[in-house]
Amino acid sequence: KVPVLTVWDVHDYGLNDAGAEFKHREAAERLFDFVWAIPESDARRARPGVYGSWMLGPEGAQMQIIMLDTRYFRSPLKATDEMGAPGKERYLPDNDPSKTMLGDQQW
């Protein structure tokens, strides 16, 4: 028996490049739980986001797998001011220290 560990793919979230501003993120998470048959007893059902951590393997030879949710809590991306310009095609670097990719829960 092999466990299947799941987290958002680039398009699973429901809107390309969306983060915490996605107004349907809670519905997307419920659908994710349904499609992947996440058990009601799973900790991910009791909190927002689909991140998780699992210990796998026999005693003394275990490994930890950590899967991050980089969409549910992520601050909005900074849109380009010059569409298509080299290095500025869609988004710009954003050094705003108040922005987050993981949110407080995962950090």
Task: Name the predicted role of every residue range.
Residues 1-107:
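Metal-dependent phosphoester/phosphodiester hydrolase catalytic core
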